[in-house]
């Protein structure tokens, strides 16, 4: 995380004059043929522009259906699998890494999916500018950068202010689902979300939930399991 930008998180729809620290680093990456195909052929069909006002996603998808938004889908394997397994639902992915966007869109083209759209820009801007309040059934944040060093903790995306932004965008009863493979970050997210108003932890013990069946296991996660590494899932429901 070496960059900042002019548009901070807002919970009242108003821009703030200070500059916001980004929670991600823009990485250069070489495109494969398939990824480039995804961008060239799928981009015009499935990449949504950053809007100035809330988007009517019923119009975008041509129907009203349960709607999930994932922040930072990486190479898109899990999101693609989830969208293919639930054609009755609509999915929106947000990712700034162009090879990842291309990989996901290549999969969308290959599988002929109609229930997935993509933003290739900052997720905070997408939430603030494009997503209406009380409109999402679920928001997913899987394996975000934990920013291990203490001096970098301010760069973590999960903060009280972010939790409030997510809460506003979720419908009543909507779910904020997080997952991480680094236990200190899991503990940190649990602490933040437990302090965030307007949420209920869905874990029976008030901590973590078992891996939900709807979250696919990635190759990285399987390798970690073989090495004895854990993964922690957190699910918080919007209440009130």
Curated annotation (Swiss-Prot):
Which UniProt keyword terms apply here?
Answer: Methyltransferase, S-adenosyl-L-methionine, Transferase, tRNA processing
> A Pfam family name for this chain?
Methyltransf_4
In this UniProt entry, which cysteines form S-S bonds? Answer: none
Keyword tRNA processing set for record:
yes
Gene3D superfamilies the UniProt entry points to: Vaccinia Virus protein VP39 (3.40.50.150)
Record EC number: 2.1.1.33
Which reaction equation describes what this protein catalyses? Answer: guanosine(46) in tRNA + S-adenosyl-L-methionine = N(7)-methylguanosine(46) in tRNA + S-adenosyl-L-homocysteine
Q: Which GO terms describe its cellular component?
A: tRNA methyltransferase complex
SUPFAM superfamilies per record: S-adenosyl-L-methionine-dependent methyltransferases
Task: Write out the ranges of the annotated region (Disordered).
Answer: 1-20
| CDD domains on file | AdoMet_MTases
Q: What is this protein called?
A: tRNA (guanine-N(7)-)-methyltransferase
Give the species. Answer: Pseudomonas putida (strain W619)
């Amino acid at each position: 995380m070496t960059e900042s930008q002019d548009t901070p998180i807002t919970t009242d729809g108003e821009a703030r004059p200070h500059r916001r620290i980004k929670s991600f680093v823009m990485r250069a990456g070489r495109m494969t043929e398939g990824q480039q195909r995804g961008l060239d052929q799928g981009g015009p069909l499935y990449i949504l522009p950053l809007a100035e006002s809330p988007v009517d996603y019923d119009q975008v998808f041509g129907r009203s259906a349960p709607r999930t938004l994932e922040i930072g889908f990486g190479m898109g394997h899990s999101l693609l699998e989830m969208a293919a397994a639930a054609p009755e639902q609509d999915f929106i992915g947000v990712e700034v890494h162009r090879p990842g966007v291309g990989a996901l869109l290549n999969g969308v083209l290959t599988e002929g999916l109609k229930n997935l759209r993509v933003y290739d820009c900052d997720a905070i801007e997408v939430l603030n500018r494009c997503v209406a309040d009380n409109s999402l059934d679920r928001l997913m944040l899987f394996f975000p950068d934990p920013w291990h060093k203490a001096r970098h903790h301010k760069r973590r995306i999960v903060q009280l202010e972010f939790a409030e932004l997510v809460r506003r965008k979720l419908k009543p009863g909507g779910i904020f689902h997080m997952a991480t493979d680094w236990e200190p970050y899991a503990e940190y997210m649990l602490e933040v979300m437990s302090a965030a108003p307007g949420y209920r932890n869905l874990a029976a013990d008030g901590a973590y939930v078992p891996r939900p069946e709807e979250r696919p296991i990635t190759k990285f996660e399987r390798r970690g399991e073989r090495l004895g590494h854990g993964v922690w899932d957190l699910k918080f429901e919007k209440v009130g």
